[in-house]
A protein has these predicted regions:
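RNA-contacting regions in translation and RNA-metabolism proteins
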Residues: 1-141
Length: 141
């Protein structure tokens, strides 16, 4: 795994989130009006809170859309977590021309959800998977 560098803005967002939720954050990415938090394994419940109270409180404080991804040391599990509610049939990771590529099998009815508006979901997945598991590309099948 490559070293993750955080901007001072990200460090502030992490400190705010951790102080408001008691969840531990592994990474933070600020991207186009949204903040993506990678939550340590097992802390997702604390991050969300009862009835979503914690995440809603953080959202009001930062005035941006908040997305949470639960971290996993296992790349396949992490990729599934990064896709959120999308049903993933399978994930295969292989080397192609010297690059690590994850092939994600998604049902055709959920492919649009996996891609997201203007490709925002697939780009998010590619970004976090690259940062945490050195996977160069994610391809939907």
């Amino acid at each position: 795994m490559s070293e993750i560098r955080l901007s001072t803005e990200c460090v502030r967002y992490i400190a705010l989130f951790e102080s408001m939720t008691d969840a531990s954050i592994k990474d933070c990415i600020i991207d186009d009006g949204r903040v993506i938090y990678v939550v340590n394994t097992g802390d997702m419940g604390a991050a969300i809170g009862k009835r979503g109270d914690n995440i809603n409180r953080v959202k009001r404080s930062v005035d941006k859309h908040i997305e949470l991804i639960e971290y996993s040391d296992e790349p396949v599990t992490f990729i599934k977590n990064a896709f959120g509610t999308v049903s993933i049939k399978s994930v295969k990771i292989s080397n192609k021309d010297g690059n690590k590529v994850a092939y994600v099998d998604v049902s055709s009815s959920e492919k649009g959800l996996a891609i997201g508006r203007n490709g925002s979901n697939i780009e998010k997945v590619k970004m976090v998977v690259s940062r945490h598991h050195d996977i160069d590309d994610v391809i939907l099948e």
